[in-house]
């Protein structure tokens, strides 16, 4: 069997992807993702897996719509489904690279949720991983960040899988060329305007090889850290389905080496953001929690003492997102909550923060209540699912599903390297 198909099949086995498991494939139109699309399409045919290609039209370049159509056309030629996901709305004038990445993932995650596909394949390869290490090291990242990208990582509606994380991009290009797959080179990948583009023009092969080797070392360390963190959570943490967290005060009397990391991850999940606050800020918070702490805010969260020697962590009201409407299926994602309604027309309904006190017999800290998701019809309060408040016949369910869940010992090592 040729190198890439065999490599892909072994990676899928390592990821626990079985016959019949649906696969979503993120394809930009570059050589690496086109190779991924071909490998996934062939694998799907052999193993009876549904394969759906997802390509994002980001609208940042005049060619982006045509490039997305190019991907969809090749998906059809390979006999797999495809969808073009469009980033609508205004584009930022600064921080474009980061904003584009965040919107791309948001569109991909929502498509996986809508299509009920739990496995999202990404085409990152060995050089991408090495470049990520070098960029993070230049920014002063610690051991956690220097592990680079994970081979497997959970998100709200499934898993991100990177089967090619240990393979050279030259081998992916050769595979694409052998199969007659035309690709598009994104000019922003080579421009000096962006950090990765600058790195690609300056990093040597030896530097990249050593950087990748270092990600394997730090990946092993990160996995050990996450295993210790999981044990810490089991002992000291209660994460409520209402989106707040309670930590036992005794957690701050220990000399647990993962305490700052564990606390940062809790803040990230409660705030429903991609990254934890800066390490120094979290370490300062740990010091305060160990000595006469009265309360503070950090990373979009509020932290305060709670009765019976506990600490309450909940969403800061000013950091809550704006109201969102339901899609045509009656689904909305708001502030880390997956909200679904049915049983009545919902065109005029929105999800927003309750933003007011409300008497309830449900056992919930009063300070948390205004931050809970609520359903409004033309600004009139109708339902607060977590509190049992209901003023119409509509059925509603709200599940706390942060974009990236609390640490679950992701796999930071590539399944195979070539």
Positions of the model-derived regions?
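Residue-level detector of secondary-structure boundary/capping sites
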Residues: 31, 62, 91, 99, ...
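Regulatory helix in c-di-GMP signaling enzymes, encompassing the GGDEF I-site helix
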Residues: 100, 203, 376
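Flexible helical/loop "lid" subdomain adjacent to adenine-nucleotide binding pockets
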Residues: 118-119, 125-275
